[in-house]
Amino acid sequence: MPLAQLAKAAGAAISRFNRVLEINALPSDEWDVVTEQGTVRAQHVVNAGGCFAPEVGAMVGVKVPLVNLEHQYLVTDSHPALASLARELPVVRDSRCAAYLRQEGQGLLIGPYENWGSKPWALKGMDWGFDRELFQGDLERLMPFLDRCMERMPIFSEVGVKTVINGPITHTPDDNVLVGPQAGLRNFWNLCGSSIGIAQGGIGKYLAQWMVHGQTELNMASLDSRRFGAWADRNYCITKGIESYEVMYTAMGANENRAQGRVRRTSPLFGMLADKGAVHGVVAGYEKPLWFRTNEITSEASTWERSAAHPAVALECAAVQNAAGVIDISGSA
């Protein structure tokens, strides 16, 4: 609301409970936004449709690469140990629990991101009648993770559950927000797919810079909505969206490439390089060779430090530096 008040003070008009029916492109590069209460002529349109972003995108003939999943959190009854604290507990994010745990008043708020058994929602499209309703809670689906939460924070096992909140949340294939120009359209922008909205509260500032100045003060490549092309079809988005949800709180190494949706795009050299022992990662959907197995080094573990493959990479660098080599960088084109 404070942002809305500031916008209105600066001259913006806000129309609520007014569904958009059509978005039509004009030869002037403007848009006619047809609503239930009339048509608005707009120089720019921003798709900030949240769960409805794919439906909004469909109005202008584009596919928005995100999927909705159910996410639950619960609030407990009060606990005397929390009531007696002089300061609030810090927020805990635990990979084994796959959950966040924090104090809520004199109780706890706990929200698992299930490592398995997550539940996608509205895969066949959103119902325009949906208006921020919540779903029935399903604690049985969370029990393996709640049991671990009780081990992590034993007072959780000593209180009852007061409230279970279950609602939809959007996830993109890589779990980064979709922001920036829509490929193939002029003056149409995306600002959607935010699965952790509180962490991206300032993203509107950078979209505004992009729209007004054509660039931003930050490198937005990892968030640019054009990073997904036609190759990221609906099945891919569903598979990767589910994976994004289920690895949300998994500790992943810097050298780790997610397993789902692989071998999506390949160069003509893919098969030959794989036969020669190439270990592939993913760049823009392309299988990109990272290093080659040797007789001594056949794999590397997930790590944030120098991996077991480092000596093999050193041999490859020396070969290219001292002789010659061909490097497949199709995914960087």
Range-by-range predicted roles:
Residues 1-44, 52, 201:
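Helical element adjacent to the flavin cofactor pocket in flavoenzyme catalytic cores
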Residues 78, 86-104, 255-272:
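Phosphate/diphosphate-binding loops
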Residues 62-86, 144:
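Central beta-strand plus flanking loop segment that forms part of the substrate or channel wall
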Residues 64-68, 89-93, 99-100, 160, ...:
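Short Gly/Pro-enriched turn/cap motifs at secondary-structure boundaries
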Residues 218-219, 224-333:
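Glycine/proline-enriched, intrinsically flexible loops and inter-domain linkers
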Residues 44-62:
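Flavin (primarily FAD) binding-site architecture
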Residues 100-102, 108-112, 190, 288:
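Short hydrophobic-aromatic micro-motifs
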Residues 2, 96, 105, 119, ...:
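C-terminal catalytic lobe of FAD-dependent flavoproteins
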